[in-house]
Amino acid sequence: MSATELKAVEEADEWRTAQAQFDEAAEIIRLEQWLREVLREVQREFTCHFPVKLDDGHTRIFTGYRVQHNINRGPAKGGIRYHPDVSLNEVKALAMWMTWKCAVVNIPFGGAKGGIIVNPRELSPNELEHMTRRFATEISILIGSDRDIPAPDVNTDGQTMAWIMDTLSMHIGYSVPASVTGKPLEIGGSAGRVEATGRGVTICSVAALEHLGRAPHQTKVAVQGFGNVGSISAKLLEEAGCTVVAVSEDYGGIYNPLGLSIKRVLEYRAREKTLKGFPGAQEIGNQELLTLECDLLVPAAIGNQLTSRNARDVKAKLIVEGANGPTTPEADAIFRERGIFLVPDILANAGGVTVSYFEWVQDLQSFFWSEHEVNQKLKAILSRAFNEVLKTREERKLDMRMAAYVQAVSRVAGATRERGLYP
């Protein structure tokens, strides 16, 4: 394997990235060796291979994972994703990132993640439901409202969560709405949950612009990824006064240096099921979007998009990570060297888990808040977290990512230290 090929393999390993980020934070805060050993590994990793009968009568074996990184600050929390590229290492990294994400915004959860190796577009609605319910049964020994609370992630949604919640409820004989979050409103979901991650990205973006002394109306934005997070981020950033010049989906995107009307883009995509052919815009590739002339770049698609191969070509002076792990350590080092201000994923996209926390609290109380209340509480928590990380950055002379990690790792280490080792 050539040096170039080896580097590409290294940069593609999210678990290596997650551990490297933790190691750096642990070194900065001089974390005790025993705590380093505890926190750099996951607490539980569960792999299952389970059969599902397809519509044509054949049986297919699926592979699924559920990983819990740390539960010393509370029940585990993390999404379930359906994707053909799901791997155990990816799920482990995402579980670790969830631990830090919950800690940096100071909500009482640990980190978890789950996934199934599948392209859900290849399954009928009936097959998708059967697969989901069987997976829920397999992981039912791990999940529950006081143990591990799943949520939607890549290619999963409120319907997926409804099936999981119903499956768990049928097993025990009564409804357990707090066992999952991101549910439809009719069965205990929270107002504002669908928009929460994108709203959090917007809150952090506006706070970062204010810190940098730049007004939203002076800001051109490029958003990679136009799913739930990307589309809502683009819409809310436009409402905040920014000019969105580019958006993209998995196959590519559209660009207009004078700005796109996100309302019209959303209407066009809903009608045509694609961004291709949107009038008044030129088609661009996903990688091309990352290096466009813009002030704010929001990578909101998948991991490992900003690497050593394109980091020097990024023209934005502000990056706000809507996706999980979109930047490799190699790219991070280049951005630090270039003085690019980056708001890390564990802070920038924590809006989703924060409102999931609100949903869990509302379910346990059977008392629900208005969307305005949810949004106000979300803004208060994320604004406080942003300012705490900014203060740590300035006091310790760090970048925002490492400041967020120092904040998060310190909190989790403190809880672990107080609880001690059993037995």
Q: What residue ranges belong to the model's regions?
A:
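General beta-strand structural signal in soluble alpha/beta enzymes
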Residues: 93, 149-151, 174-180, 223, ...
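N-terminal ligand-binding/catalytic initiation module
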Residues: 1-191, 414, 421
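Conserved active-site and cofactor/substrate-binding residues in soluble primary-metabolism enzymes
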Residues: 13, 17-20, 30, 45, ...
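Glycine-rich phosphate/diphosphate-binding loop of Rossmann-like nucleotide-binding domains
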Residues: 184, 189-293
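Generic secondary-structure signature for well-ordered alpha-helical cores
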Residues: 23-31, 96-103, 121, 133-145, ...
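Adenosine-phosphate binding glycine-rich loop
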Residues: 5-13, 208-209, 312-423
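Rossmann-like adenosine-cofactor binding region
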Residues: 252-342
